[in-house]
């Protein structure tokens, strides 16, 4: 996540627009404001929400917490306890992909509690819904059904009021009634605030600035940038990966394997069993070791690294296969011949499938930047040009894949 902004910079890169857009959406940079909503009748209880559309804040008619949000059990009324607890149990059986899928039916339940909109002091009901994820943003949202697709359908489903608070210029003389809407009014660039007290008539982007200023002056919020991107969880429960050089000691805790003992090598006699765990966990010769700190008994980490770790950098090492560990340049250990790297990199054109747009093609850009910051490369992008070669399709005109059963048996 530290490299998110730099990964959004495609300047001087000849990459397909579609891949650039996919990476931009994956990183998901959102500029907006984050502010607090106080819970009615709950002294000192509040929660934070983030919005990229502060100009629609007067249209908030409800707010939603993730089922896992820490406030849910505290603010839920006695009358709603059973239905809320049942909903939390049901949502816990769904994974994040299921919960956020566009095709997943949006469901939720009312907690019985209310929050106060700091811009107009109106009370809005607090719901929980599994399409809100606790680990993304604040784990809570302000819901503006008049100007958000998801909120609109949720409000119609549960008979929650809808307010129109921004319109397009051509709608100013005849502001739509919320009951006549077939969908939300989404246009941002030409939007003008209405039904918003003394903000009426304020156009975007001035509307963003004015509301953000008031929120800040009230002391309830501030400008903020959010990212959809999370840090990379690299551990995998598989045999054929790069070992993670960590040992666990009962006395000293978690310790890194000393540099002079690297690389940690995989055994060649592991036994594979249908346990769902890595064979390394049952290989005594690999598992048992000594603590580099105290010399006592210790165990190695048995998870290995994600395959994309290796494919993000090993092509640099391929340029100097006989380079030996310990060879140095300017008294610094270097894993490859820097002269060959300078002669041949960055790559002029990389040919790769678009299916890797948010995986390998993002990871190897990230790795190149990290290696440059470590002084191991003198450039920050791995390739100047990307060419997507397309897919081989089966007779059913779908991507040829084992999972689809449409491959040709050689």
Located regions from the model:
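Catalytic alpha/beta core of large soluble enzyme barrels
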Residues: 69-168, 185
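Residue patterns forming the tRNA-binding/recognition surfaces of aminoacyl-tRNA synthetases
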Residues: 1-47, 54, 70, 140-263, ...
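Short loop/turn motifs at secondary-structure junctions and domain boundaries
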Residues: 104-109, 238-239, 382-384
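Long C-terminal interaction/binding lobes of large macromolecular proteins
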Residues: 44, 57, 74, 86, ...
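Short Gly/Pro-enriched turn/cap motifs at secondary-structure boundaries
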Residues: 24-27, 102-107, 303-306, 403
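Conserved active-site neighborhood of enzyme catalytic/cofactor-binding cores
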Residues: 113, 136-147, 153-167, 241-250, ...
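A short acidic-Thr-Gly-centered motif at the start of a beta-strand
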Residues: 34-45, 116-118, 134, 294-297
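Conserved catalytic alpha/beta cores of large enzymes that bind or transform nucleotide phosphates
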Residues: 86-112, 160-170, 198-212, 216-217, ...
């Amino acid at each position: 996540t530290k490299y998110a902004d730099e990964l959004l910079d495609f300047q001087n890169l000849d990459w397909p627009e579609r891949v650039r857009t996919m990476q931009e959406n994956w990183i998901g940079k959102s500029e907006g404001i984050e502010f607090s909503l106080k819970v009615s009748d709950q002294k000192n209880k509040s929660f934070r929400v983030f919005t990229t559309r502060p100009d629609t804040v007067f249209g908030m008619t409800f707010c939603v917490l993730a089922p896992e949000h820490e406030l849910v059990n505290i603010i839920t009324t006695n009358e709603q306890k059973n239905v809320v607890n049942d909903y939390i149990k049901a949502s816990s059986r769904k994974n994040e992909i299921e919960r956020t899928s566009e095709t997943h039916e949006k469901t939720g339940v009312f907690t019985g509690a209310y929050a106060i909109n700091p811009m107009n002091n109106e009370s809005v009901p607090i719901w929980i819904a599994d399409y809100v994820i606790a680990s993304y943003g604040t784990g809570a949202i302000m819901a503006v059904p008049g100007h958000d697709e998801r909120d609109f359908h949720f409000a119609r489903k549960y008979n929650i009021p809808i307010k129109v608070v921004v319109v397009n210029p051509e709608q100013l003389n005849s502001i739509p009634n919320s009951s006549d809407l077939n969908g939300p009014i989404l246009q941002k660039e030409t939007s003008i605030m209405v039904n918003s007290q003394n903000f009426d008539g304020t156009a975007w982007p001035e509307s963003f600035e004015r509301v953000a200023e008031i929120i800040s002056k009230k002391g309830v919020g501030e400008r903020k940038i959010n990212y959809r991107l999370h840090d990379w969880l690299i551990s995998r429960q598989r045999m054929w990966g790069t070992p993670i050089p960590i040992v666990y000691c009962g006395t000293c805790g978690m310790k890194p394997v000393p540099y002079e003992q690297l690389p940690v090598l995989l055994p060649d006699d592991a036994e594979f069993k249908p346990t769902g765990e890595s064979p390394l966990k049952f290989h005594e010769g690999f598992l048992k070791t000594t603590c580099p700190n105290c010399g006592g008994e210790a165990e190695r980490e048995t998870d290995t690294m994600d395959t994309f770790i290796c494919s993000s950098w090993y092509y640099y090492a391929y340029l100097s296969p006989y380079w030996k560990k310990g060879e140095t340049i300017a008294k610094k250990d270097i894993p490859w011949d820097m002269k060959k790297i300078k002669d041949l990199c960055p790559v002029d054109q990389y040919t790769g499938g678009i299916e890797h747009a948010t995986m390998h093609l993002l990871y190897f850009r990230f790795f190149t930047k990290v290696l440059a910051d470590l002084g191991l490369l003198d450039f920050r992008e791995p390739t100047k040009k990307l060419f997507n070669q397309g897919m081989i399709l089966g007779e059913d005109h779908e991507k040829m894949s084992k999972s689809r059963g449409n491959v040709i048996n050689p």
